[in-house]
A protein has these predicted regions:
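Switch/communication elements of ASCE P-loop NTPase nucleotide-binding domains
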Residues: 1, 183-301, 491-495, 501-508
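Conserved P-loop NTP-binding catalytic core
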Residues: 1-50
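Acidic, Mg2+-coordinating catalytic modules of nucleic-acid enzymes
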Residues: 302, 306-308, 316-508
Length: 508
């Protein structure tokens, strides 16, 4: 493992990198007094303490010399020094890292997980070493299937595991990969037999190789190892991602550490399996089990930086229109600033979600109606106490009322002429008499009465005009196209100006 100045916090090499990990399931070979038996941190007077529960602390430190130093830390009350742990000893923990570069993991070199898996299954590395020695003497041409038979024994189990992950393959076998230097362990590699052909597994596609690599790591983890998987979703279809996470959850041995930017992983995992790491933070935030509903309905929330929690589909659509308007004016959008819309689907979940997400380290605000404020007053107060900005309609108003009573008369006429294109249902019906009344309206009082009449029709239960995302987008476009005509002191206009600024976009 190599380091550079870029690995240090703010590239300050005067502050060393220090990482400590507490490990259990310690390989038996490391528990002798000659090794690290005296460094176990458990209470050794406890007769009930089993070997699998014994724990040690391994510390990695890197100073300005950029040389990594690995030690096992001494017990706090002991008089012994920290002890260096070698790469060979660390390898016994079977920690492996899965990335996009997996080709070398299908060869039997000593640093590959396939080598570790075979050695673990056979209980000995001699069969592999024996083949290497023979190859050095006679080269690859002298090796036939009989020579590889013993290495093929563990591959039946590996085939079962990889098929559980959703990969359909032929028979697996160990063969000579003629690409590699025949004098190295890389020339003995995993192959697949199909249609009378035998091809090195490294020639498979990215997704297939990744699944095979994960299957090998899973088998190793079953012996108490640790697997690190970066961006698990890379090269995999959504159904396979879900299958992988489900199988990981069933594992009762070993450990799997996964990083992801996939909503499919968030959906399939359980809340207590999820930890959030925010940029600039030095600790992880564990997702609360109470967040299950939010996790299932808004998995995208966990990948944002700034979250707008809104009440329902109308608000979501309205914010989408705001995002499109921002893109036209600033050549940037919500994604540029890491802004994500979260639909709480009404009730006090708006404020519950907002507070929980705030506690996970996200920057959060609320954009919602204010027509049932008495019922939600305690939740609102809790959100304010958590320093969450609330961009709410005037007291007693839903978003539709706030808009209909705020826009200019010309914009109002455009609103009632909505053609409902793309709407999931079409509920806008105006009688000829009402259309004439609207056309003939002159006084402010007449126009106000008409606005209130249209509002009641627009929010009528089970016949709502805009209670869906396309409806919200339409309302958003009406408001934003009429923005300059709305008075500066209007609550809707004030909220939109503040919300844009909160998102990171200046005032027009």
């Amino acid at each position: 493992m190599s380091f550079s100045d870029l690995d240090f916090h703010y590239q300050d090499t005067s502050s060393p990198i220090e990482i400590e990990v507490e490990l259990s399931d310690i390989p038996h070979e490391l528990l002798s007094e000659r090794k690290f038996g005296l460094y176990v941190i458990n209470d050794l007077t406890d007769d009930k303490c089993q070997e699998s529960n014994l724990r040690i602390i391994i510390k990695l430190s890197v100073n300005e010399s950029l040389e990594p130093r690995w030690v096992v830390k001494a017990r706090p009350e002991s008089d012994i020094e920290d002890k260096v742990i070698s790469a060979q000893e660390r390898a016994l923990f079977a920690i492996n890292f899965i990335t996009d570069y997996t080709d070398n993991q299908f060869a039997y070199n000593k640093i590959s997980p396939l080598y570790s898996f075979t050695k673990s299954s056979l209980g000995d590395s001699k069969p592999i070493d024996k083949i290497k020695s023979k190859m050095l003497r006679t080269m690859s041409a002298s090796l036939g299937n009989d020579d590889m038979a013993e290495l093929n024994r563990p591959l039946a189990k590996l085939k079962t595991t990889v098929e559980q992950l959703g990969l359909s393959i032929g028979e697996l076998s160990t063969g000579i990969d003629i690409k590699e230097n025949p004098y190295t362990g890389n020339s003995i590699a995993l192959h697949e037999r199909s249609d009378c052909m035998e091809l090195p597994f490294r020639l498979h596609g990215k997704g297939s190789k990744r699944l095979m690599s994960i299957a090998i790591q899973m088998e190793l983890a079953q012996t108490g190892g640790i697997a690190l998987i970066d961006e698990i979703e890379q090269g995999l279809e959504p159904d396979r991602i879900a299958t992988l996470v489900r199988l990981f959850r069933k594992m009762d041995k070993g450990q799997m550490f996964i990083t992801t930017h996939s909503m499919n992983v968030i959906l399939e995992a359980e809340a207590n399996n999820l930890f959030v790491l925010n940029k600039g933070e030095d600790s992880l935030f564990q997702v609360d089990c109470d967040m299950d509903n939010c996790r299932r309905s808004n998995p995208q929330a966990f990948f944002g930086k700034k979250l707008i929690v809104c009440e329902g589909k109308t608000e979501c659509g309205f914010l989408r229109a705001l995002d499109m308007d921002i893109e036209k004016k600033y050549d940037a959008n919500f994604s540029t600033k890491g802004v994500v819309i979260v639909n709480a689907n009404g009730g006090d979940k708006i404020y519950t979600y907002a507070i929980k997400l705030k506690n996970l380290g996200y920057d959060v605000c609320v954009f919602a109606d204010n027509d049932v404020s008495e019922e939600l007053s305690k939740s609102m107060d809790a959100a304010r106490q958590s320093s969450i900005p609330l961009f709410l309609c005037n007291k007693g108003n839903c978003l539709e009322k706030e808009i209909i009573m705020s826009i200019s008369w010309d914009a109002f006429i455009s609103l009632i002429k909505c053609d409902e294109e793309g709407f999931p249902n079409k509920n806008i019906e105006l009688s000829d008499d009402l259309i004439k009344e609207i056309t003939d309206a002159v006084s402010d009082e007449d126009k106000k009465n008409i606005r209130e009449l249209i509002l009641q029709k627009a929010i009528q239960k089970r016949h709502e005009w805009f209670k869906h995302i396309p409806g919200g987008e339409f309302l958003g476009m009406i408001v934003l196209n009429d923005f300059k005509n709305i008075p500066d002191g209007n609550n809707l206009k004030i909220n939109l100006v503040k919300l844009k600024k909160w998102c990171g976009f200046g005032q027009d």
